[in-house]
Amino acid sequence: MRLKDKVAIVTGGAHGMGEAEARLFVREGAAVVIADMLVADGEAVAADIAASQGRARFVRTDVTSESDWQKLIAETIATYGRLDILVNNAGISGSAVGDPDALEGWTRLMAVNASSVFLGTKLAAAAMMPNGRGSIVNISSIMGFVGSSENHPGYAASKGAVRLYTKVAASKYGPSGIRVNSVHPGYLPPMLNATNAGTRAAKIEATPLRRLGEPIEVAYGVLFLASDEASFITGTELVIDGGYI
């Protein structure tokens, strides 16, 4: 098992990529705390994992709240004794905030997609330091590399912030044995569910592998970076996009 006896937190773990990551981590031997605002969904995922003899629990968490982060990490350590891995997966899309020219939407995207990563990383790193090691994986996007007028400007900016903050954090926490890396997914079915068939087809045509990705394909990349297999990798950017960029 690639994560045997590890303890992980996965934010946004109630659905989509986060759920895939949480389930894969448990299959690979980890205990996982699922953090999300979607209480019913998060509790259902944790219960389903537990029913299959896995170790998982759910903690309702607003990732933009420092006090919620403190509670999440404290409950994780109280339950499982330590924290080895954090996946900063929680995020929202530009469509969730509406008007691309409104400051309110920009501010919300920055808070959920970028400030949450700063909060989680600094607090998780502090909890990992007594262990002398740890792994933090921050989920960005291919939009963290390339801007597009098709997206809310705050979305690309927030994902770019995650990419660069990850490099800063890798440098800052590396001497404590804590690795920090970013993952940049391309287009997945959940991201295009609300779009028309023409847009979906265009994204597939622009992807050299001529298909959309699946959450589990991103999860396997996250698993690698979280595991000891990546013990000499920090500050890197793993793009999982079928060749889109």
PLM ranges: what are they?
Residues R2, F118, R211-I245:
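C-terminal substrate-recognition "lid" of short-chain dehydrogenase/reductases
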Residues L3-V33:
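Canonical Rossmann dinucleotide-binding motif of NAD(H)/NADP(H)-dependent dehydrogenases/reductases
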Residues G174, R179, I233-G235:
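Short, small/polar-rich loop/turn modules that mediate ligand/substrate recognition or access, typified
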Residues A126, S171-K172, S231:
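Alpha-helical segment proximal to the catalytic Tyr-Lys
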Residues S141:
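Residue(s) in the substrate-gating loop at a strand-loop-helix junction
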Residues A96-T107, K203:
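Substrate-binding pocket helix/loop in short-chain dehydrogenase/reductase
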Residues T121, S158, T166:
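Active-site helix of classical SDR
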